[in-house]
Structure formats: C-alpha cells, structure tokens
C-alpha cells in the first residue's frame, strides 16, 4: 500500500497554481525558505552535493538549494505542484530534476545515491511518517545528512499553527493542518534513530505577528527542523 494521503494531495493540487505567488497561501513558505536553506547549507555545504528534496511541492526549496550549487532532484506525488515546479524552472533557469514518485519507491530505485536528503513540511501530511524517514535513510549515502522539519504536537502548537495561522492571522487556508498528525520532537527522534539516523541538531522556527517576521530560535514548541546523519 502506497504511503500517500490522497486528500492531502488534492488539497495542495487545488492551490498549486499560486505556489510561487509570494502574497498567496504560500507566503509563509517563501518567508521561511531563506532561513531553512541557510541552516541546511551551513551544516551540509550544498555546493557540489547531490541533494534529494522529498515532498518538494512547487519547488521553492529545491530551486534555492540548486542556486547554492547543489545538483537537486525533487520528488512529490502531486501532479499539479510538479507541473508548477517545472514551469517555474523554465522561468528561473534553475536546473532541478523533478519526478512524481514516493520516497519509498525512490529508495528502491536509488539507494545510497544522495549526499543530502531534505524532507521539510511533509511528514505531517502522510499516513506513515516513520516509513518516509526510513526511506530517507536508505536514500542518503553513508555519512550523508538528512534534514527533517514538521510541527510539534502540543496545545501551543495547536493555538499557533492551527487557530492562529489558519483562523486568526489567516496565513494559511483553513484545513491546511490536522493537529493529530503533528509530531513531537521525541517521536521524530525515535523514528530517526530506529531508521539508523543520528540526531545531530534541532532548531525552532518562530513567528512574530507584530513584525510579521520569522526567525530561527531554540523554541521548538511549534515549527522545528532536525539535522540527522547516517553512519559512515
């Protein structure tokens, strides 16, 4: 059985045409992208590396990593987001290889082929996130790094990521997130270790509604990113 939630795919298919509109529902992704790319680049040194972006959507992160000198492959199961990613690539001239395939299928085809694997803002949208993490471990080279991000599961995360972001501030469309699918850092850490990945670092992403700015912080109560590494 494929590790795909078709309702989640349909949700992003409907919004895909606005993926690169910086004032659309995807504004938060555009706003946090420089912070995420810098954090990854500082730890992985993207230039000259082979990178797989799992759950690439319309290619915001994929293109940014390619601009840093990485050879990037982006995979997603959404047909419309991938079409948008390919169209934007023609406009930007940034080379990314986009494929419609799951991480698990990709791991069967290309095990141990990538220096770096990223899987950001995707794990909370699949039925079995631990399966995706196991696939990421299989895809990365020995000694390679896997970067993951998701949303913590606690009352504060519900207040900020669902009530605040979707209903009060209207940063995201209502129904973007299902609180039950949010993932605690302890759970993400356990799944990573079970897959054979060592957790190296964790950082939070916080939003100030007054300044409308995001920043990296030690507060992992809501959005957070994790750096992991496969044994050499």
From Swiss-Prot:
GO molecular function, one term: polyprenyldihydroxybenzoate methyltransferase activity
Pfam families from the UniProt entry: Methyltransf_23
Organism: Pseudomonas paraeruginosa (strain DSM 24068 / PA7) (Pseudomonas aeruginosa (strain PA7))
GO annotation terms (biological process): methylation
Record flagged with keyword Transferase: yes
Protein name: Ubiquinone biosynthesis O-methyltransferase
Keyword terms: Methyltransferase, S-adenosyl-L-methionine, Transferase, Ubiquinone biosynthesis
UniProt catalytic activity: a 3-demethylubiquinol + S-adenosyl-L-methionine = a ubiquinol + S-adenosyl-L-homocysteine + H(+); a 3-(all-trans-polyprenyl)benzene-1,2-diol + S-adenosyl-L-methionine = a 2-methoxy-6-(all-trans-polyprenyl)phenol + S-adenosyl-L-homocysteine + H(+)
SUPFAM superfamilies registered for this protein in UniProt: S-adenosyl-L-methionine-dependent methyltransferases (SSF53335)
Catalytic activity, EC: 2.1.1.222, 2.1.1.64
Entry keyword Protein biosynthesis: no
HAMAP family assigned: UbiG
Binding-site positions, S-adenosyl-L-methionine: 36, 55, 76, 120
Pathway assignment: Cofactor biosynthesis; ubiquinone biosynthesis
Its job: O-methyltransferase that catalyzes the 2 O-methylation steps in the ubiquinone biosynthetic pathway.
Homology family: Belongs to the methyltransferase superfamily. UbiG/COQ3 family.
């Amino acid at each position: 059985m494929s590790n795909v939630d078709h309702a989640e795919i349909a949700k992003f298919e409907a919004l895909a045409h606005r993926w690169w509109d910086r004032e659309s529902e995807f504004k938060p992704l555009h706003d946090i992208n420089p912070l995420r790319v810098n954090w990854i680049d500082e730890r992985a040194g993207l230039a000259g590396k082979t990178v797989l972006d799992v759950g690439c959507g319309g290619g915001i992160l994929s293109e940014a990593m390619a601009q840093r000198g990485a050879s990037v492959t982006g995979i997603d199961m959404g047909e419309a987001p991938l079409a948008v990613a390919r169209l934007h690539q023609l406009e930007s001239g940034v080379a990314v290889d986009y494929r419609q395939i799951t991480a698990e299928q990709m791991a069967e085809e290309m095990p141990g082929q990538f220096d770096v694997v990223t899987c950001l803002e995707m794990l909370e949208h699949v039925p079995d996130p631990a399966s995706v993490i196991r696939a990421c471990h299989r895809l990365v080279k020995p000694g390679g790094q896997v970067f993951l991000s998701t949303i913590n599961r606690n009352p504060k995360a519900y207040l900020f990521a669902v009530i605040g972001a979707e209903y009060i501030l209207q940063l995201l469309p209502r129904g973007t997130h299902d609180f039950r699918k949010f993932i605690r850092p302890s759970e993400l850490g356990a799944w990573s270790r079970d897959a054979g990945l060592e957790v190296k670092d964790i950082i939070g992403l916080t939003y100030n509604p007054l300044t409308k700015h995001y920043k990296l912080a030690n507060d992992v109560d809501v959005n957070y990113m994790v750096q992991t590494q496969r044994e050499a």
